Amino acid sequence: MLLEFQDSIIRGDCRKILSGLSANSVQLTITSPPYRNAIDYEAHIEKNGYYRGKARKETGEYLDEMVQIFNEHIYRVTKDGGYCCIVIGNEVVNGTIIPLPHMLLSKLVQPFGNWNLHEEIIWHKVTGGTNRYGSFVINPYPKYFRANIMHEFILVLRKGDVNSGRTNRNDILPAKHEEFTKEIANSIWHIAPVPPGYIEHPCPFPEEIPYRLMKLYSYEGDLVLDPFNGSGQTTKVAHNFARRYMGIDLMDEYVSLAKFRLDKESIHIRPDALIAKWQKIRSHYLPNL
């Protein structure tokens, strides 16, 4: 049952939908799981609803659900040599950081899970993040410091060993091009977030993230999955770059939004770097005598 799912955006629970998808059919998954407690998505749908900070799930319950989805359902439908990229950040509860990315990762990768960790990329948001430094401005004393949170993690998981699925050598990437040597070559990606209110969704990741991941981990014609499709950033980028796509979301409003955005909006891929060009600088260390 593959053809009926290709190039589709479906409303439903991804666990039920994926149970009807053939095993070993997805080359690449790109997704950002729903925030555990930071976002109330139902309240966001109600235009006047306050949607931040509504506690809904205990950490253990959230992790168990995510482990079931990624270790069982998504792993089963992923091809040998395929990849799963999870965009996820820490949460802050009552002044304490909850390291959800690392807690989840410890349960997904071998020896405790099914996946292999291929890469861990830090998404540096550059122009936006969670403001926590203000409390230190008000109370400029030791032990009051809180850093602004300007990053999330992109966990790149692989099914199979490092050489799995490397038989196709079409679509050579310009590995010496500046986009790849300056921007993608390192484990920190500098990508500005989507401006607040630009898309009718509380937390869309920028299109540049799925664009890069599709370029690096898939070929044209491959099936790309987003089981938490939301506003449709993954499916939109896949559609525009000749990938087959499959998006799943629980809410009718987001399914309709994602379908609408497939052809109605242009792609937003930044042509220039957000950080200065690299250059050698003089060392401040004095030579040893």
Language-model regions, residue ranges each:
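S-adenosyl-L-methionine
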Residues: 1-17, 259-289
